Amino acid sequence: MIIVNTQKLFNQLKQHIQTKPFVLLQIYSDVKAHPQENRVSCYYVDFQDEQYIVPIHHTEKYQDEIQMIETNQTIFVSDIKKYKHNTLVISKDVRDMNWSYYLQHNKPYDFEQHLTGAHHHYNRLHYNKDDVNDLVPLVKHIEYLEPIAKNLYQSYEEHDQTTLLTLQDIERHGLRTYEKMVYSEYNPYTSTGRPSNRFGGMNFAALNKSDGSRKEFISRFNNGVLVEMDFDAYHLRLIGEIIGYQFPKG
């Protein structure tokens, strides 16, 4: 394991990234903030035979500014939506390992099983503070990320990712309210495969029609309007029609 704490080591990593595919995982600084409004505490880069940890906003960082890297190599990530929101390395070939795991097992990978005692301690101690992950020692982030990279990479199978890329594109644009932009987060990892849409305790897919919850959302354009559309995508009735099953009325 190499902790990138000098420019020399960062240059070494940049060269290595050009040579072969690798796993790229990230730890966000704030466990509560939306990825679009968050920042990365550190990156974990796994080449199978060698691993790097790169502190970005972590307290153990060696400098304030880190250059982004471009590569033609394949990058394996645990969440392509979060990768698109914030990344250290840019590539045209990015594979989502958790999406592959979900399509094989009909459930997402359990990341929380690898959280260390240090992660739980800092989150309990600083539950009301921002950027807590910047305080968790890098060695503990490594301990958390190592098994994730290994397990997901070993089980990866290639699948179409159009759904994830489309959802991320919707997420990054946000929703305008009278006060600010707010961001939702689509969760495609449901038992039915029908994505949910929520963040920060708000279910954007089921806003109350009678208590004024919907009134705060406005068009981002001058003289613009919001148009509501209802459609049948992901509805179980569509599957019934395909296989000839008649659902009972009511």
Label each residue range with its predicted role.
Residues 1-115, 240, 246:
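Conserved RNase H-like, two-metal-ion catalytic cores of nucleic-acid enzymes
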Residues 3, 20, 145-147, 205-207:
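A short linear-motif detector with a strong N-terminal bias
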Residues 21, 164, 223-225:
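Residues at beta-strand starts and edge strands
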Residues 33-39, 48-49, 179-250:
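Acidic, glycine-rich two-metal-ion catalytic cores of nucleic acid-processing enzymes
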Residues 55, 60-70, 79, 153-157, ...:
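Alpha-helix initiation/capping motif
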Residues 86, 91-93, 97-108, 112-117, ...:
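Mixed-charge, glycine-rich, non-catalytic linkers/tails in nucleic-acid processing enzymes
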